[in-house]
């Protein structure tokens, strides 16, 4: 039986995924369950980047997501004002990324490929653990590291870096909040709740699942199906009550293959 994928990423990303899935022959709709806001303190983000630019050592900025990258460079540009040149990446600095989407965002913002470190494109997972496996043997003692992220999030990687002797600071380059669904999105949510077998949810964050639970309190999920981009996210979907949950790599090609497998039965 065919099914339509519900892409719950932030609105702009969700719409892009819908188009990419359509090109692969997969029906999809955007139902954003996370809204992205700008950095709450652009001046603080710019100050961090200025320190990186002025450093004579080899500082590292760890970007945890594409939103972290885009929010960071937008905040720097905003703080420096209209007419200022676009921020150029200092080649003595390294940009660490947790996955291919973050790498793509860095390249889009002008970071040279030779300055980027990330898990291999064929890695089984794209997360802090996979990134740490790539850089654990770097010389971290007294090295300056900025972790660029949104509000909240795990501190696992930060703790590994501190234990290795790095001077770790956290920079918030964007904020994640619960979405304000428009009328069409609310109607789509109602359809998905009324006919769960017609849909497959695609989750790329546990926070999106929490927002879904808040938007549909008391809903039954035992007939619903989901794809999750990480085991922790799959655990959260299972805990909410989803009847079938599969783990899939965070790419449209992988999602298309998983949808085909899930709907074959």
Label the predicted regions.
Residues 1-265:
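Conserved beta-alpha
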């Amino acid at each position: 039986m065919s099914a339509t994928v519900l892409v719950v990423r932030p609105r702009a990303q969700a719409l892009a995924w819908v188009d990419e899935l359509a090109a692969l022959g997969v029906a999809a709709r955007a139902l954003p369950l996370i809204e992205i806001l700008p950095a709450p303190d652009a001046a603080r983000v710019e100050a961090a980047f200025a320190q990186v630019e002025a450093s004579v050592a080899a500082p590292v900025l760890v970007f945890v997501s594409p939103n972290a990258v885009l929010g960071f460079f937008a905040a720097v540009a905003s703080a420096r004002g209209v007419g200022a040149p676009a921020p150029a990446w200092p080649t003595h600095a390294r940009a660490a990324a947790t996955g291919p989407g973050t790498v793509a965002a860095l390249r889009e913002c002008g970071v040279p490929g030779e300055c980027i470190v990330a898990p291999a494109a064929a890695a089984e997972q794209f997360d802090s653990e996979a990134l740490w496996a790539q850089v654990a043997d770097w010389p971290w003692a007294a090295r300056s590291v900025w972790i660029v992220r949104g509000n909240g999030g795990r501190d696992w990687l930060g703790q590994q870096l501190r234990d290795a002797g790095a001077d770790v600071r956290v920079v918030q380059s964007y904020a994640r909040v619960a979405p304000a669904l428009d009328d069409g999105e609310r109607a789509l949510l109602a359809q998905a709740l009324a006919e769960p077998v017609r849909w497959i949810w695609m989750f790329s964050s546990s926070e999106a699942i929490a927002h879904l639970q808040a938007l549909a309190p008391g809903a039954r999920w035992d007939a619903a199906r989901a794809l999750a981009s990480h085991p922790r996210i799959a655990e959260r979907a299972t805990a909410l009550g989803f009847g079938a949950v599969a783990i899939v790599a965070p790419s449209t090609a992988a999602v298309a293959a998983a949808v085909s497998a899930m709907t074959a039965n």
